């Protein structure tokens, strides 16, 4: 067994050779990187937890402006994933994870101060929302970086754990936020409370800055752990070879399928709180969006973990077929409750939305199983990085389309009908190329 180097770069590393592999270092790398990836997802989605409170503390923002705030982290996340895909061989794991984690301090501190002043210009809020997308970019750097440390027989397990646990960051931030903003976590050290007015004549103090300041100590801890305990594997980077994936039609087919699955997960995670607010907020005794919003990403993340082994046994294509059918029917069910006449319809609206999250989580796992089966090893990593980057635009696409639909039609039913067309198209693509008998690339 290889003894880990004390400096940054490891020499003579080969996970396929037990004498040149250090499993303790590999698993340590996985857990530290996963901890930091979870913080990245928390930062990426903290805006979705904040926006539903902003109008009630004095920010004068329209529905369209609120949706654009949830859109910007997705715009940044997708773009930055393309950049982060190329960083692991350049920076190495130690520097990549350490410095990427420290970058999270910019949006966390920025939002912590911005929410305390209702006069903060809208363009500043948009910029801070965009910067929160830094957390979304990390995924495409951390995943390949971690893969360098494991033999192929363990890469599926290791990366499945990292992706699955990292996704829980979305539900963590949406679950913790309504609790943590309810008391003076830092006393008066980092600012006083805001006046929250859930309905006319009723007000209470809240500390919105806690939603971001609370994660700063964890970010500093994550960066310290990465710098002290992580090492880097020298990897030859040949970027020109990777570009041939764009000449393969299956790259584009899998991109579409992953937009259906992870794009739906990430997109609905961003807008679920606002959907609850806009669709059911008009009723007396309207539900608090943040009491329910975290359930969606929680269900989706659990489904991804569960569906991984099932995809290994049954094959990714057949599980993706089930995912596509499930998302389509769930979206159809949602449309029955997007123009409610009473709060009695709210429970079924939540159930239908959770079904979308469940089946999108299933598809997240199965599509990751398909790609290594469709592409040779040299291309598979690039395809996974590319599809993950494009699907990370989910929050941007879903937020802007939902805002446009609401503005044009006064509701969200047409938004879900449009998604159903896209889901049906992807059902056909997956069936024709991968799932049917005699398919071009059975997987």
Swiss-Prot record:
GO terms for biological process: nitrate assimilation. It is found in: Cell membrane. The keyword Membrane applies. It is a multi-pass membrane protein. GO terms for molecular function: antiporter activity; nitrate transmembrane transporter activity; nitrite transmembrane transporter activity. It catalyses: nitrate(in) + nitrite(out) = nitrate(out) + nitrite(in). GO terms for cellular component: plasma membrane. The chain crosses the membrane at residues 32-52, 66-86, 95-115, 123-143, 172-192, 210-230, 256-276, 292-312, 314-334, 346-366, 383-403, 409-429. Disruption phenotype: Mutation has minor effects on the ability to grow anaerobically. In contrast, narK1/narK2 double mutant is unable to grow anaerobically. Probable nitrate/nitrite antiporter that may be involved in nitrate import and nitrite export during anaerobic growth. Belongs to the major facilitator superfamily. Nitrate/nitrite porter (TC 2.A.1.8) family. PANTHER family: HIGH-AFFINITY NITRATE TRANSPORTER 2.3. This is Probable nitrate/nitrite antiporter NarK2. It comes from Thermus thermophilus. The gene is narK2.
